[in-house]
Regions:
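Short arginine-rich
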Residues: 472-475
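Formylglycine-dependent sulfatase
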Residues: 23, 29-30, 38-430, 435, ...
Length: 496
């Protein structure tokens, strides 16, 4: 069959049109490639949101049913949820120091509350500040000694705009004065106190700190920023502004199954408080839930600001807490012990383009692992002295050969304990004797000591060996405690 021949001028027009189309296509492809290259090289913003004394089970993304937390859950849905993330030491100052430095408490040297962070510590914020980031911090710091509230500590540790950083306290109402921010509730002597004093949606601590965060984000639309906001709630006192104060007054508060356990099921390092009863839990928890709800609503305001500014797709967002709150579990309140409610904390991370949405990280991690993981995602070099591990492969869904163990330690106030934790087991050695092994799969409420079971010997030996290696590598003096040393040696078959 002969081919149809177009007139010569039509062929020329067709060729010209083809060239124009090809040129247009090449232009689009070039611009797309340039845009992708720009996006790939454009540095991430870093936003760290920290709460205080927060039980992970109050969040929807960790199975909580009472408080709806859609904004915190959004972070989990669009990033990664770490299900076995622990406070390196489950009290305020040591945990916070470990998070910002990547070092264990004995190296910060914040081993207890109110100990100042060492002058030589280089935080993640300092690294990013040197890189050219605009950096800032608002909320509770608790790493500058005894000052209370002590606004804007002189030592900034890389958080350049620290006007709204205060060192200590769980204040409920803030305001501005000619001298700067102030606690806006005072006792009869004129000293700041923890009362609500009519705090509203503008002056209540959570709302006020969220607004400072929003202002910083809006001010830094065109330059990479690193900002950390540390909300003092839901730490006690259990009070919250209207309408959150009555939102959960009629809810049926679940009572922990461990609240009235027998003494035989209670380690010496965690004696129960006989004053803590089911009625105590019913009284305290509705306001605790209200604080969590207020936090979630304000985190929603912060996320909406990132969306409005088109920064949401270029910002690493981290949500975590410094430690948990037992909320009546094991007949105790607050923290300080290696029980799950005290030591296990929420940890969520969004990193657009690198962390797949909906990732679940089950392996055990602790606060010291945050900084190495963050810098693996941002491409920054770690400063000297960091002791944590880069877990970015886990968060990117590629960590098949991860060494599943984290190490926890007590404060330097009182009798020491050391713990090795995996996603299933928790082994605790204490100066008070009688090591404890919890199987979190078969005993999630931590009621039974599996240390004496014959079938536990292999995991006890392995975790003890790992704990000894950790102590040697990181110069942890607790391993030298006479009782702990003897119990570990016996578990390893080294006892005389």
């Amino acid at each position: 069959m002969s081919q149809l021949k177009l007139p010569q001028h039509c062929q020329a027009l067709g060729q010209a049109a083809g060239f124009r189309a090809m040129k247009k296509l090449l232009t689009v492809l070039l611009l797309t490639a340039l845009g992708q290259a720009f996006a790939a090289t454009k540095p991430y913003n870093v936003l760290v949101i920290q709460t205080d004394e927060h039980h992970f089970k109050t969040l929807g993304c960790y199975g909580g049913k009472i408080v709806s937390t859609p904004n915190i859950d959004w972070i989990a849905k669009n990033g990664a949820t770490a299900t076995s993330f622990y406070a390196t030491t489950p009290v305020c100052s040591p945990s916070r120091a470990a998070l910002v430095s990547g070092r264990y408490p004995q190296a910060t040297p914040v081993t207890n509350n109110n100990i100042p962070l060492g002058d030589d510590i280089v935080t993640f914020a300092e690294v990013l500040r040197r890189k050219g980031y605009n950096t800032g911090y608002s909320g509770k710091w608790h790493l500058d000694g005894l000052g209370k509230p002590q606004w804007a500590p002189k030592r900034k540790f890389g958080f350049e705009d620290n006007r709204f950083m205060f060192n200590r306290g769980h204040w409920k109402k803030f305001a501005f004065s000619k001298a700067g921010p102030r606690v806006d509730s005072r006792n009869k002597r004129g000293a700041p106190d923890y009362k609500l004093n009519g705090a509203d949606e503008h002056t209540f601590a959570t709302d006020w700190l969220a607004k400072r965060t929003i202002d910083f984000i809006n001010k830094n639309k065109g330059k990479p920023f690193c900002y950390m906001v540390s909300f003092p709630d839901p730490h006690g006192p259990n009070t919250v502004r209207k309408p959150y104060d009555t939102m959960y007054k009629n809810v049926e508060v679940p009572i922990p199954v461990s609240i009235n356990k027998p003494r035989a099921q209670t380690p010496r390092w965690a004696a129960a408080d006989p004053r803590i009863t089911a009625d105590t839990v019913r009284l305290l928890m509705p306001k605790y839930y209200g604080m969590v709800k207020c936090l979630d609503d304000n985190i929603g305001r912060i996320l909406d600001t990132l969306r409005k500014n088109k920064q949401i797709d270029n910002t690493i967002i981290v949500f975590t807490s410094d430690h948990g709150d037992l909320c009546g579990e094991h007949g105790r309140l607050n923290k300080g012990v290696p029980y799950e409610g005290s030591a296990r904390i929420p940890f969520l991370m969004v990193c657009p383009g690198k962390i797949p949405a909906g990732t679940v990280v089950d392996e055990a991690l602790s606060c010291v692992d945050f900084m190495p993981t963050l810098f693996a995602l941002t491409g920054d070099k770690l400063p000297k002295g960091v002791q944590g591990r880069d877990a970015s492969t886990l968060f990117r869904g590629k960590g098949d050969n991860w060494d599943d163990v984290a190490f926890l330690r007590s404060t330097s106030n009182g009798q020491p304990w050391l713990a090795a934790v995996t996603d299933r087991y928790k082994l605790v050695y204490s100066s008070l004797g009688q090591p404890w092994l919890f199987d979190l799969k078969t005993d999630p409420n931590e009621l039974q000591n599996a240390f004496g079971k014959p079938e536990s010997k292999p995991i006890i030996r392995e975790l003890t060996k790992r704990l000894a290696n950790y102590a040697k590598r990181n110069s942890d003096p607790y391993a030298g405690n006479k009782q702990i040393q003897a119990d570990m040696a016996q578990a390893l078959g080294q006892a005389p």
